[in-house]
Design a protein with these regions (language model features):
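Short, threonine-centered small-residue motifs that mark membrane-proximal processing/anchoring sites
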Residues: 1-15, 19-26
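Extracellular carbohydrate-recognition regions
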Residues: 26-49
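Short carbohydrate-recognition loop motifs
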Residues: 53-80
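Short, surface-exposed loop/turn motifs at beta-strand boundaries within globular domains
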Residues: 62, 93-95, 111
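Secreted extracellular polysaccharide-interacting domains
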Residues: 70-97, 129-137
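Extracellular ligand-binding interfaces
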Residues: 103-189
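Noncatalytic modules at the cell exterior or secretory-pathway interfaces
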Residues: 192-197
Length: 197
């Protein structure tokens, strides 16, 4: 049975509320007729991932629809991505708020919900890909998974008081590993100048 995750379309709006980025500050509504740089893609070695826009489920937090991400096996991954060049070189310390909503149905793994991934570089001096900075809701629970199936949950990626954030490349980013995730405040204390790339 495929695992299904629903990501609120509010993600597009939430990602665009950056301080100091006038061109990016407006809320943008994403729908199948106007993707505005967003799209679905397989992001792993498998081929059993799929993405689409759906109505619901239940009452979506921001409007009537949501983006549905489905994976059919553990080798597959599906992402909703944005490659808008306006985000290249964006200083992560300029983002003032970041939240999104998810719905994990009962066919999904109760420990997994859609994560946020940013391709990052430790500073603006170089433009190389140095891995990803990932926010994973599972790591925000102080005792066990905070993910509740069959209901919408909103994740405040900056307000989590326990973990949540980790880097995929621990050679470049020695702190905030998947085994020892950090809060946003800790990420900024360890690495005050990371930028997107």
């Amino acid at each position: 049975m495929p695992s299904r995750f629903i990501l609120s379309l509010g993600l597009g709006a939430a990602l665009l509320g950056f301080a100091g980025q006038d061109a990016l500050a407006a809320n943008i509504v994403v729908d199948p007729a106007n993707l505005d740089g967003w799209g679905f893609a397989e992001d792993n070695s498998g081929t059993a991932g799929a993405g689409s826009f759906v109505t619901g489920p239940a009452t979506a937090p921001l409007g009537t629809g949501s983006a549905q991400l489905s994976v059919g096996d553990s080798a597959s991954g599906e992402v909703l991505f944005n490659y808008n060049s306006a985000y290249t070189g964006l200083a992560l310390n300029s983002i003032t708020a970041l939240s999104y909503s998810t719905y994990v149905d009962s066919n999904g793994d109760p420990d997994l919900a859609p994560a946020l991934d940013f391709n990052v570089d430790p500073n603006a001096a170089t433009s190389t890909y140095d891995g990803r900075l990932i926010f994973e809701p599972y790591y925000t629970g102080s005792s066990g998974s905070p993910i509740v199936q069959n209901q919408w949950q909103t994740w405040d990626a900056f307000g989590a008081t326990t973990g949540g954030w980790w880097f995929s490349n621990n050679t470049v980013f020695a702190n905030c590993t998947q085994a020892n995730p950090c809060t946003w405040a800790q990420v900024m204390a360890f690495y005050p100048d990371p930028v997107t790339n």
